[in-house]
C-alpha cells in the first residue's frame, strides 16, 4: 500500500510539473522578418503564377531585421530572388497605419520600379510621405487606406 501511495504521489508531482510549463503553440504576430510567408499583390507574372510554395522573405534591408510598411525585403519566389516593397502587414502598427489580414508586398526591380502594372489591394497612405522613393509604386496604386 505504501508503494502504491508513493507512486501516486510521484505521478501527481510529475503532472504538476508538466502543467506549470507555459508555451504557446500559436504563431507570433510580428511584422515581416526572415522566413515570413508573404502575398504578392501586384499583377506581375512572377507573383501570380500558382506554385506549390508561397513566397518567403529571406532578408530585410534595415538595421533591426524586422520589416514594416515601406521597407524593402528580398524574397525567394519560384526559385528566384527578387526585391519587394512591403505595403501591408498583419502586426498592428503605429497610429494611422492600418492592420491587414495578410503580409502584402509589391515586387520591384533593383532600381525601385515596380514589376507589375497594377496593385490589386488598397495601400496605406503613409507611403505617400516617401513619394520620392516610391513614386512609381504610388502611381500604379488604385486605392489608398
UniProtKB/Swiss-Prot annotation:
Range of the transit peptide: 1-30
Keyword Methyltransferase: no
Keywords annotated in UniProt: Mitochondrion, Ribonucleoprotein, Ribosomal protein, Transit peptide
Gene Ontology terms for molecular function: structural constituent of ribosome
GO CC terms of this entry: mitochondrial large ribosomal subunit; mitochondrion
Compartment list: Mitochondrion
CDD domains: Ribosomal_uL14 (cd00337)
Gene Ontology terms describing biological process: translation
Pfam families: Ribosomal_L14
Purpose of the protein: May form part of 2 intersubunit bridges in the assembled ribosome. Upon binding to MALSU1, intersubunit bridge formation is blocked, preventing ribosome formation and repressing translation.
Family designation: Belongs to the universal ribosomal protein uL14 family.
Record-given protein name: Large ribosomal subunit protein uL14m
Organism: Rattus norvegicus (Rat)
Source lineage: Eukaryota, Metazoa, Chordata, Craniata, Vertebrata
